[in-house]
Amino acid sequence: MITATELLTIDAVLQELDRARRNGPLQHIVIPPCPELLTRLQKAMSEAEPDLNEVARIATSDVAMSATLLRAANSPAYSAGGAAVQTIGQAMNRLGLQRTAAVMTAFLARGAMKVTAPQLQRFWERSTKRAVAMSHLAERLPGISADLAHTYGLFCHVGMPVMAQSVKGYLGTMVEASARIDRSYVQTENANHRTDHAVVGALVSRLWRLAPSVTAAIRLHHDLEALGERSADPDVNALVSVGLLAEWLMRRHEALDPDADWVVHGATAMGWLHINEDDLNTWFEELQEAFDAV
């Protein structure tokens, strides 16, 4: 794989993924197909004026997904003490179209990638927390799409369950990578398997036709040397930076120390976004209820 400083454009990332899929270590990675309902949802949401009836039809085509939407709409974060919603239409009105699509995307992704390994026990819980935090932050920062931020937060580490399902010995690698202090998590993954969860996750994003900026951000979320580069794609830099903030906020909520990426690159991310510690503390307080609800 080429270095992060050579992947300053989205096109460079996409070309690297395509080469690795054709001739490199990604040839034998089994990527779950994108769920048909998610493909339909993506098509509906890509229209200049999305068809609300089509989104509702997709939602009601799966009983469990309908129940998930109703539960989200009736959660403290959205109900504000109001009467409980009882129909998908009511839930969509309360949540709004973008949040409705985000809840549906999370449900469908979770169904497509079953996680049974104990090493990944809280995978979807933490992915959902990250997505919630990122959309919250994006709404408070200029020029960042809350929809893209939520999608990136949800899929950021999706390479892990994919590798756990299709790469022999990967669960052992996860244990080793978490324990080692002499090299990073992705360095251990690459030493053992010639690829890592950031690359595999980016491939999932590409094959599932997520936004190119999301694909590039997933690919680069642990290769942070280019984070402060002016020539790097600003949308990708913004997503990766907000992702670092979200991870810091999550770990603080879980009473954990900041991770290594934050220790080294947190100040750069804050500088890129033009924020300070007071902003972080304010957002931490704002997110408590949302984190507890996940």
Please annotate each region the language model reported:
Residues 1-173, 179, 183-258, 262:
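Conserved alpha-helical "signature site"
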Residues 243-294:
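C-terminal appended segment following the main domain
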